[in-house]
C-alpha cells in the first residue's frame, strides 16, 4: 500500500479485489479524500452506478460529512478486465489532470493499481431519451463547443483511424467461444476492415477540422445541472484529438441508446437546431445556411465512422470484458447500421 505524489495527483499502490470490493473502495476513499480520512467503513455508503460498459463505477459518500465541498461525494472507477487493450491509460491520465487544472470536468484525486478516483459532478446523468430534447441539445452543443476550443498537451493527430486499425487487428479469425463463432462469422470482420479503408479515403475529402474531442458522448456521460441549466461531461477514457465530424456524428448515433433503437436518430431539423447552437457557441457568430449544411453533411458521414469505431471496440470487449453486456450483439448492430445508412449518407452533397 505504498503511495507517491506525481504532478498534481497521487498514485496509491493498492488493488481492489473482487472478494473485498466494498472494503477496497472504503480504503481508497479514505486514502485520497481528506474529508473522509477518519470515516469508518460503516460511515461510508457505496452505490454502484449505471451506464458504464467499459468499467464499473461506484459512488462513495460519508453522509455525516457536510456536503459543502464542491466535489463530494466521490466516484471510484474500477477498470474493466484487459481494458488497457482499448484504452491508452497514459493519455487518459494526461487529459484527466489537464482537464482538472482547467476546470473542465471533476476534481481528479489520483490512481490506484486497478482504477482511479475523482470528484462527483452535481447533477443527473441523462437518459438516452433526454438528449434529443431541444433544451438539452442546446446545453450539450455549448459544452461540445467549449471542448473543441481548448488546447491539450497531447499529440494533435486524429486518433480515429489508428484506433480502428488497432482494434481491428485484435479481432480473431475464429471466435474463442465455439458456440458463438457462427454468429461472429456473420459479422464478416474482413469486409468491415475493407469498408474502413474505403471510408477513410472518402471522409478525407471533407477536411473536417482536428479538435480536442470527448469521443464518447453517450447519454450517461452527460451530467445535467438544472440549477445552472448546463451540461458537463464525465469519463475521459476515449478523449483525444479527432475529427470534429466524428464527435458530432457519434453523439447523434447515441440518441439510439445501447439497444440500439435507430428510429431515434435525429432528423435533419433536430440536427440543424443542435448544429446552430454549436456554431454560435464555438464561433460567436450566426451560422449561414451553407455552414450549417456543411456541418450536417460532415456529421452524418462521420457517423458512419462512429459505427466502425464502436463495432470493432465491441468485438475486443466481447473477448475480454467481464461486464454483463452482449458486446457481440452490440457490435453487429453497429455494423448493420453502417450498411443501412452508408449509401444515403455518402451521397449527401
From Swiss-Prot:
It catalyses: ethanolamine + ATP = phosphoethanolamine + ADP + H(+). InterPro entries: Kinase-like_dom_sf. It comes from the Eukaryota. Pfam families: Choline_kinase (PF01633). Disulfide bonds: none annotated. Its main location: cytoplasm. Keywords: ATP-binding, Cytoplasm, Kinase, Lipid biosynthesis, Lipid metabolism, Nucleotide-binding, Phospholipid biosynthesis, Phospholipid metabolism, Transferase. GO terms for molecular function: ATP binding; ethanolamine kinase activity. It is found in: Cytoplasm. GO terms for cellular component: cytoplasm. Highly specific for ethanolamine phosphorylation. May be a rate-controlling step in phosphatidylethanolamine biosynthesis. This is Probable ethanolamine kinase A. It comes from Dictyostelium discoideum.
